[in-house]
């Protein structure tokens, strides 16, 4: 059999196994919205650990991680730094959000915020922003899956078909099983990704240099020691400033747990102990990224001049005499990285669109409360969103990447509102709305006009400063929220 089709066969086998593992768990939960969105609030430590870990590490982990190490050296450690710190807020927010969900039936981040600040408009605004950000994010995962299957088949599987094959599988298990399908497939995919990453991260330095230590020594001896000096390089090859590096880590860490598809998993946790223990153990998931970076470092001398740098892993696989089964498993691992974030994004986008958007419209609220109508509408929304993302992935020429440039800086603007929701009783509805809008606008202004920055720090930091100032000053001069509402959250 042709090597190409052996590799394709391994990838297809992986997709089939993912489908089975995604469909079966959905048979064990109730048919309610709570069962579909939060798994009847029954996720144990193993599931929650992997659903949070695998859902945030997308195809960028397998492609972008090595690319950063290859082109920017130790600047790639930024990814590990913010991932290690990013879960800390959920140690404090997570158990409170979970308890509020159990007591009052909340399933999404925006439901909490709109209730605390007594603003249906805030809910609709957050639903709109969430879908606007998550659709391009999902589109990029589809692009990654299509690229993998197109590359490993030497073009015999068209790009559009590769994306469709992978994401029809994702659509099926998310559509029928909801968050439990996401949870069990992410557990499988997470273990699979960790295994492949560690094997490759140790194998390539050993094969090319004789080990990890000799690899770094060779890079130093070739006059590229600047790539090994913290904080590394910028994309143009110049030295990254500590201010730029530190602010990038800070804003990414703040925004990390604020992603709607990430935050809403707190409502699925079985109990407070599970939530807190997951946060404590979560930094160990960064061990997945360490060998991924070794892959990029191993290619600096062996495969110079590869552009774009994100293609370095496929380039290494195609130009080294690796066993065909290993290449197939690595390709399946890259699919796993794409699917393990894509499924969580797709599920969250559908749930948020209905729970935080359509449900806030008076003319639809009563209809959605009847039987399992809401669950069915969420499923239809998931179908619509997946088709829309597929359109952007393979048909439209729209520059979706530009929509994602300020994503972390933008999503980090939710942090002051979430913090104040639980810990600052004086925060008001008007204060929250003004703060959120001002923070997002400031982030976008400094993103697209960086010459306006007074210092070389991430634009999201400027947004947060303006956000906090607006929240405090406007809240102090506007009407306070009813005490009984505030106490529900501060005493949660």
Residue ranges and their predicted role:
Residues 1-492:
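Membrane-embedded helix-loop-helix hairpins and adjacent transmembrane boundary segments
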């Amino acid at each position: 059999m042709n090597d190409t089709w052996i590799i394709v066969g391994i990838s297809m086998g992986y997709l089939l196994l993912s489908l089975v593992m995604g469909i079966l768990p959905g048979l064990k939960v109730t048919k309610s919205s709570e069962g579909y969105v939060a798994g009847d609030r029954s996720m144990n430590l193993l599931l929650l650990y992997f659903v949070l870990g695998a859902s945030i590490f997308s195809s960028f982990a397998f492609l972008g991680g090595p690319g950063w190490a290859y082109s920017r050296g130790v600047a790639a450690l930024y990814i590990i730094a913010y991932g290690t710190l990013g879960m800390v807020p959920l140690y404090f927010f997570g158990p409170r959000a979970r308890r509020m969900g159990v007591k009052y039936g909340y399933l999404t981040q925006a439901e909490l915020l709109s209730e605390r600040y007594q603003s249906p408009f805030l809910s609709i605004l957050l639903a709109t922003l969430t879908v606007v950000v998550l659709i391009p994010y999902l589109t990029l995962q589809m692009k990654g899956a299509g690229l993998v299957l197109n590359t490993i088949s030497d073009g015999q599987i068209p790009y559009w078909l590769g994306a469709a094959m992978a994401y029809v599988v994702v659509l099926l298990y998310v559509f029928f099983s909801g968050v439990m399908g996401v949870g069990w497939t992410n557990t499988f995919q997470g273990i699979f990704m960790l295994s492949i990453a560690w094997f490759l991260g140790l194998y390539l330095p050993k094969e090319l240099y004789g080990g990890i230590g000799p690899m770094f020594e060779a890079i130093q001896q070739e006059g590229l020691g600047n790539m090994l000096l913290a904080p590394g390089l910028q994309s143009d090859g110049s030295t990254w400033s500590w201010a730029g590096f530190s602010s990038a880590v800070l804003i990414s860490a703040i925004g990390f747990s604020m992603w709607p598809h990430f935050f809403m998993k707190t409502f699925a946790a079985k109990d407070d102990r599970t939530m807190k223990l997951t946060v404590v153990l979560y930094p160990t998931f960064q061990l997945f990224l360490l060998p991924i970076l070794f892959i990029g470092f191993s290619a600096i001398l062996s495969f110079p001049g590869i552009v774009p740098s994100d293609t370095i892993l496929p380039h290494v696989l195609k130009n080294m005499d690796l066993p065909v089964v290993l290449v197939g498993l690595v390709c399946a691992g890259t699919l796993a990285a794409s699917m393990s974030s894509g499924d969580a994004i797709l599920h969250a986008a559908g749930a948020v669109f209905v729970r935080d958007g359509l449900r806030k419209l008076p003319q639809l609220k009563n209809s959605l409360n009847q039987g399992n109508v809401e669950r069915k509408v969420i499923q239809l929304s998931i179908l619509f969103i997946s088709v829309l993302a597929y359109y952007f992935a393979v048909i439209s020429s729209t520059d979706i990447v530009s929509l994602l440039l300020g994503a972390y800086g933008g999503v980090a603007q939710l942090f002051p509102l979430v913090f104040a929701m639980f810990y600052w009783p004086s925060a008001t509805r008007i204060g929250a709305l003004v703060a959120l809008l001002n923070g997002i606008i400031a982030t976008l202004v400094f993103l697209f006009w960086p010459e306006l920055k007074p210092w070389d720090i991430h634009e999201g930091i400027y947004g947060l400063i303006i956000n906090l100032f607006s929240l405090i000053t406007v809240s102090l001069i506007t009407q306070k929220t009813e005490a009984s509402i505030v106490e529900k959250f501060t005493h949660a």
